[in-house]
Amino acid sequence: MYSTELGINLFGSESNKKIQLNRIKILQKKINNFKIFLVIAGTNTSQIKGISAAGINAKSRRITALADAEFLLKGASKDHKYKLPRLNAGVTPALISHVCSKLINVYPVIVPLGIGVRPYFNHLVVEDRDLGPSNCLTTGKSMTKERVLNLYEKGLAIGKSSKQPILISESVPGGTTTAQAVMEAFGLRVSNLVGSSLFKAPRELRRKVVQKGLLNANLKTDFDSFDVVASVGDPFQAFSMGLLIGARLANQPVILSGGSQMLAVILLVLEFLGEKNKDDFIEDVFIATTGWLVKDNSLNDLLNLINEKYDANLLGLASPLNFQSSIYKELMDYELGHVKEGVGAGGISILAFLNGFKNKEIVSLCQQNLEIMKGLGQISLEKDC
């Protein structure tokens, strides 16, 4: 469904769209008051060859999240410390998020979890950096439950103290695989629906990885959301569960900006809440992503699957951003199905559109930043040798 008035595409629940549209209009009045969180997290699941496009090899994927966060804050600049990883095609979606966050004059808050280093730029300290990435989900023991609960409680406290609407975004190499594992742990068969940053989703590889993780986890019938995250999840999921619930307890609207990773967080929260206060909770929760990610309809099907399982009416928002007019291959690659989403590109660009900015303006600024990146040698599409 396309909203002519708002200029954005809607997907997901077919019911109560009129009510949802009114809520989106309310968001328009709060755009410049939004608090954007970028949660960058590490999972050793990303080290599996062929699992992610967030860096061309395992070594580069270790710094992808840090480089994305740095670029989100600074844009194209000569004083970058973390080198953006080489990609087979496209360019980091942090480019889109940087441009659009600057347009709406919002400075993102970076939350590093399991990265292993303390970033030099401003960030929120949530846990000891020495904890490092979560284990590969194939172990069935991604994290201790103590760590999961600590991350959840920290997120909950931050969310409950929020005095403004929040947008949650992520950069988690390997995160779509942990998202799939979480959803399948709760009985959803989603291997053909979960997207990927890769041009062609590694569905068979992910299926085997998830299957091995769930087998080793050996979850019993009485497991809960925290058990699942501890078994096959990642730090982002634990923290974001708390952040989302806390913000809603503070009666703040929440935009979850991303794809399957955000739907995994929603599912974990719905499982945790049960029927109690479910309707009040989801009333002002929005899933936001790019138009490129919803092109093949898989994300729409995935959202509807969750709506059906939990008798919910979640609505998705798809950004109208496109690079069809771009003169650069790196941006045109998005139109061909490369990269698609990440670093909150969909949700943050939607905020820019709702604030009155046009596609032409966003594309122009993306191209300007890309030109600077090329001049500084910050972008490379060379293939790994």
From Swiss-Prot:
Molecular function per GO: nicotinate-nucleotide-dimethylbenzimidazole phosphoribosyltransferase activity
Cross-referenced InterPro entries: Nict_dMeBzImd_PRibTrfase (IPR003200), Nict_dMeBzImd_PRibTrfase_arc (IPR002805), Nict_dMeBzImd_PRibTrfase_sf (IPR036087)
Name of this protein: UPF0284 protein PMT9312_0438
Residue ranges of coiled coil: none
Similarity section: Belongs to the UPF0284 family.
Signal peptide: none
SUPFAM superfamilies: Nicotinate mononucleotide:5,6-dimethylbenzimidazole phosphoribosyltransferase (CobT)
Top-level lineage group: Bacteria
